[in-house]
Design a protein with these regions (language model features):
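Alpha-helical transmembrane segments in inner-membrane proteins
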Residues: 1-340
């Protein structure tokens, strides 16, 4: 039976299209990555970038590229990958196309926890991703408790997410009021962006991106099983509740890692899986990796536009994504209500 299913998959003409989409996506990701590194207020070229890679130092271009742009672009790529995977997983687990770490309050929980460390315990900034993960899990548990009624109800999930986000946003506002002398470094972080990103941020988020990419191969099979329904999934040997817990934990970890380095970025996990679902379909074997690829592309492009469009003024990426994502979210919400 396994051999037959593999044979069918090979013969399926859609698999060629899906593989082509991912291959072209990888090429586009590499191209966008390098182009973004040389674009900015200071003029640099591909030859300057090449000199950085071969170790030519002691030039102004080297300092700009190595210490500012390269770590910033890499951080944006990793954050985009993590948020897109997290959003795709949450949409699959909850069977809700509106699920996104930023919309349903997971990012807000991670943000409050991260902000507590950055303001009150700045000497422990290396612990920010772990603490943010704890905050994300707390938010997720509260969300499940509020939205559960013989299963997750989509409308209740959105309403509960708004309430959870408001609660944790209130906590962040309280921190800003009581520690107003220490918030200067966190204001831009709350708006969401990569200004000031360094190699420290790259090393902070990279391990979690690796975990996410490894988790993609495991998660895709589990998510495909869950789409068949609980009874069918159980008959196939899937431990449904344990699977849901594992997947939600993985999504919370990835969202928290992105929040810890980029702040409150919303809609990445909503937009990318939707766009890729239109292209590659609902098979998570293709949907998850393609979402990861194009999530990285989206945030690299968004960051590049945000820092260059109104130069020398830099628009926070979170603001830029909100202008794109909010209308898209309202469109999906309206379409979902019309179907009901």
């Amino acid at each position: 039976m396994a051999i037959a299913s593999i044979s069918e998959k090979i013969k399926d003409p859609r698999s060629k299209k899906r593989n082509l989409v991912m291959f072209l996506g990888l090429i586009l990701l590499v191209a966008v990555l390098f182009i973004s590194m040389i674009i900015g207020t200071a003029n640099t070229s591909f030859s300057d970038l090449y000199n950085v890679f071969v170790g030519v130092q002691n030039t102004e271009s080297y300092r700009i590229l190595y210490h500012i742009r390269i770590p910033r672009v890499l951080t944006a790529m990793f954050a985009g990958i993590n948020l897109a995977i997290a959003g795709c997983i949450l949409q699959g687990v909850l069977k809700n196309p509106l699920a996104d770490p930023g919309i349903i309050g997971v990012s807000a929980g991670a943000g409050l926890a991260a902000m507590i460390v950055m303001i009150i315990l700045p000497e422990y900034t290396n612990m920010v991703p772990i603490v943010a993960f704890v905050g994300a899990m707390v938010a997720t548990l509260i969300l499940f408790a509020l939205a559960w009624e013989e299963g997750i109800q989509p409308l209740k999930l959105i309403l509960a997410g708004v309430a959870v986000s408001a609660f944790f946003a209130g906590g962040m506002t309280c921190l800003m009021v009581f520690f107003s002398d220490k918030i200067q470094g966190t204001v831009n972080w709350m708006a969401g962006g990569f200004s000031g990103a360094s190699w420290k941020h790259v090393t902070m988020i990279l391990p979690y991106t690796i975990i996410g990419l490894v988790g993609v191969s495991i998660s895709s099979k589990l998510l495909n099983a869950l789409q068949l329904g609980d009874d069918v999934a159980k008959s196939l040997g899937t431990r449904v509740e344990a699977t849901r817990f594992f997947l939600v934990t993985l999504a919370a970890l990835l969202a928290a890692s992105a929040v810890s380095v980029a702040g409150m970025l919303t809609f990445v996990g909503l937009i990318v899986p939707h766009m890729m679902r239109l292209v590659v379909g609902s098979d998570f074997n293709y949907l998850l990796p393609s979402s990861a690829i194009f999530g990285g592309i989206l945030l690299i492009v968004a960051d590049t536009v945000a820092r260059t469009a109104f130069s020398p003024i830099e628009v926070p990426v979170g603001v830029f994504m909100s202008f794109i994502g909010a209308p898209f979210f309202l469109y999906l919400l309206k379409r979902g209500m019309q179907k009901r």
